[in-house]
C-alpha cells in the first residue's frame, strides 16, 4: 500500500503552492540642499583665483533645510580640482574654508564648533541636531604653479562645491 501511494504521488506530481508578495514604500528625504548664492572666482593676480569679495570674487552660499532634528548630517566640501579649465601643465594648490554663515534658530549656534573635518580638511561635517535652515559659506582659493607663482592660462575655469545631506 505504501509503495502504491508513493508511486501515485510521483506520477501525479504533488506540488506545493507558493506566493511572493511585494511590500513597497517610498521615503521622502526631510533634508534638502540648495544653492542660495552662486559663487565665482576673482583673479587678483596672474596666479590666483579666489572667491573672496576683496578680490572681486563671490563666496557661494549653500542652504540646507531639515525638518527632522538629529536625523541627518551635512557634508560640505570646498573644491580641490577644476571640473573644467584650459589645459594646465603645472600644480594647482587649493585652500578654502566651509563655515556656518547664518541659521534659522539660535539653537544652531554650536554647529561650527561641533563640526569635524575630513578629506585633508576640504570637507566639513555638521551634525544637524535642530530642525530648520542653515546657510554655509564655502570659500575657495586656487594658486597656480606649486608655489612658483605661474600665471594661469587664459580661459574659463569651473570648480564644484559638493554639499549633501547624509542620513544618520
Map each language-model feature to its residues:
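N-terminal small/polar-rich segments of proteins
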Residues: 18-93, 97, 124-168
Amino acid at each position: 500500500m505504501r509503495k502504491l501511494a508513493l508511486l501515485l504521488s510521483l506520477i501525479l506530481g504533488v506540488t506545493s503552492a507558493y506566493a511572493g508578495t511585494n511590500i513597497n514604500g517610498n521615503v521622502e528625504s526631510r533634508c534638502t540642499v540648495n544653492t542660495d548664492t552662486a559663487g565665482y572666482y576673482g583673479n587678483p593676480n596672474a596666479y590666483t583665483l579666489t572667491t573672496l569679495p576683496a578680490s572681486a570674487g563671490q563666496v557661494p552660499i549653500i542652504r540646507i533645510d531639515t525638518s527632522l532634528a538629529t536625523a541627518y548630517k551635512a557634508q560640505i566640501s570646498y573644491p580641490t580640482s577644476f571640473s573644467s579649465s584650459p589645459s594646465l601643465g603645472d600644480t594647482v594648490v587649493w585652500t578654502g574654508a566651509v563655515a556656518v554663515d547664518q541659521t534659522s534658530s539660535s539653537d544652531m549656534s554650536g554647529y561650527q564648533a561641533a563640526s569635524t573635518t575630513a578629506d585633508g580638511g576640504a570637507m566639513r561635517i555638521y551634525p544637524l541636531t535642530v530642525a530648520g535652515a542653515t546657510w554655509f559659506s564655502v570659500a575657495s582659493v586656487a594658486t597656480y604653479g606649486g608655489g612658483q607663482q605661474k600665471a594661469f592660462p587664459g580661459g574659463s575655469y569651473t570648480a564644484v562645491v559638493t554639499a549633501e545631506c547624509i542620513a544618520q
